[in-house]
Amino acid sequence: IGSGAGGGIAARTLSKKYDVAVFDKASYLNKETNNETFGYHNFFEHYGLSATRGFGIQLLTGKSIGGGTSINWQTSLETPTEVLNEWDELTKQQNYFNSDSFRESIEYVIDNLGVSTEFNNIPLKEEKLAEGFDKNNIGYRVIPKNNSSNHGMECGFCAFGCGYESRNSSYKVWLENDDFNGDIYSDTGIQKIVIDNNKATHIEVENNGETSRIEVEKVILAGGSLNTPSILLNSGYKNPQLGRNLKTHPVSGVAAKFNEEQKPWYGSMQGMHSEDFLFK
């Protein structure tokens, strides 16, 4: 359930040996992406207006085949060692997240997504950021991205998909090619997972206003951090942790007046970053 960063690679891997079906309530991304209104209405959850209670923080969540990987800013940073150590400690997995096998999995994803700094078209706004870093003796580096070329970076609509197919989204990498031996059911919302004797036996889906039950052998629920807890609650799960402990990375806009015209929507959505203040 879900075709994004988690569901895409799981489906592709399992399809090598098993019959796999991917269900997603979203539609396929229209390659004609240069329309902001159309993009918000069709490629974002709640038209880009998902928010916390009281609307304190707006949450931009993808809603297309490929999930958030189809409309995100392509920033592809590896999990810091400090976080991996914390995961090992909390899960008591005996150094699993620092093991060679886990590292091999990370490298596999990096290689397939084409993560590198080669195709990061640094825009003028990022050059200004670098100037500020230099003046304040702050370290920084170019952000690795999961794109296969700089073609289309000038279009200015990277947040609404990629009409040039330069972005290596979950759909493009894991589900679109011939290595995926499964089926994709778009525009098919998951109402709940039917559980019998502690085993998932069916899923209830909605398509074109009609609800039906589909028999399943196994279910991987990868509907994103907002929708996964909702589906589990609708399915009757009572775990008190459901829907709790969501961590977000708040972003605050900074405006300034420059002598040169900036046009910040052109080029890479994010080009430079600093890690000097992490874990301090």
Name what the model sees in each region.
Residues 17-18, 181, 216-217:
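Short, well-ordered alpha-helix to beta-strand connector turns
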Residues 26-31, 36, 64, 188, ...:
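Glycine-rich loop(s) and the adjacent beta-strand/alpha-helix scaffold that form part
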Residues 1-87, 94, 99-100, 238-257, ...:
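N-terminal glycine-rich phosphate/pyrophosphate-binding loop and immediately adjacent elements
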